[in-house]
Amino acid sequence: MIFSILEHILTHISFSVISIVLTIYFLTLLVNLDEIIGFFDSSDKGIVITFFGITGLLFTRWIYSGHFPLSNLYESLIFLSWAFSIIHMVSYFNKKKKNHLNAITAPSAIFIQGFATSGLLNKMPQSAILVPALQSQWLMMHVSMMILGYGALLCGSLLSMALLVITFRKVGPTFLQKNIKKKFLLTELFSFDVFYSINEKNAILLQQNINFSFSRNYYRYQLIEQLDYWSFRIISLGFIFLTVGILSGAVWANETWGSYWNWDPKETWAFITWTIFAIYLHIKTNRNVRSINSAIVASIGFILIWICYFGVNLLGIGLHSYGSFTSN
């Protein structure tokens, strides 16, 4: 009873804190609050509090249930939210390199944890006895590696999708460009002396516009490079986790079902996902290929991860159906 109450408290604390953090992030986009009262640093500390809250939640559920909390969809979602918190912690303590990971990790963590605690999963939040197939030491190794891999790959893929949005976003003419265009049209109505005077002002405006455009394009280029830098490294880490998870799952399957690979729906989609991200990493090894191409592949991988993660749970078929929506 005590553990159940503690779990309930930690769930609400972590969700409340991360909700406040996300609100602060949105406010800093609208108003420059970080220079006024240092809200941005406070939001980072909020994610740290959330990390420890989710960690306490997982440990409490572990002690309460008597097994590692990865036996159903609810527990795996909480663990996935914890994985996003870990990624944010890495960016928080790596302050030498400014990055925008928090813009991805915070909304992702609150969305996943919000879905897990929304009541849509029926009785899954209640701890239950493990089915015989899950009563193995391989549970911790296999499922934790897969979820960590999903978290890292999702985060890296979202960064790649942000790269595509920034790259293909059409930037409209600036106020200076519009102003210059109007002034050039007005010069046709005046004499030569006035024309010379106005064009001298236009030259100053044009120089200001060039400097502004150069500065804007420079920071845009820097942001694209930073997104590509972090997406590659996070996806590489996620690919390692996914590989270890698939291999450990194959060994576990051989011990349980007598075969390393059964082409179960989840196994098939995991293999497809692994192949897509292997293609991504192969593309990144070629420096002559633009980062846009690899970002497109990562975006495809983002969709495949959700199919692999939720597909079997929605259908409730195959050897991995014990964590589905239909099983209670």
Curated annotation (Swiss-Prot):
It comes from the Eukaryota. The keyword Disulfide bond does not apply. Coiled coil: none annotated. Required during biogenesis of c-type cytochromes (cytochrome c6 and cytochrome f) at the step of heme attachment. One of its GO terms (cellular component) is plasma membrane. It is a multi-pass membrane protein. InterPro entries: Cyt_c_assembly, Cyt_c_biogenesis_CcsA, Cyt_c_biogenesis_CcsA/CcmC. Its main location: plastid. It holds the Pfam family Cytochrom_C_asm. It is found in: Plastid, Chloroplast thylakoid membrane. HAMAP family: CytC_CcsA. PANTHER family: CYTOCHROME B_B6 PROTEIN-RELATED, HEME EXPORTER PROTEIN C. Belongs to the CcmF/CycK/Ccl1/NrfE/CcsA family. GO terms for molecular function: heme binding. GO terms for biological process: cytochrome complex assembly. The chain crosses the membrane at residues 13-33, 46-66, 73-93, 101-121, 146-166, 234-254, 263-283, 295-315. This is Cytochrome c biogenesis protein CcsA. Keywords: Chloroplast, Cytochrome c-type biogenesis, Membrane, Plastid, Thylakoid, Transmembrane, Transmembrane helix.
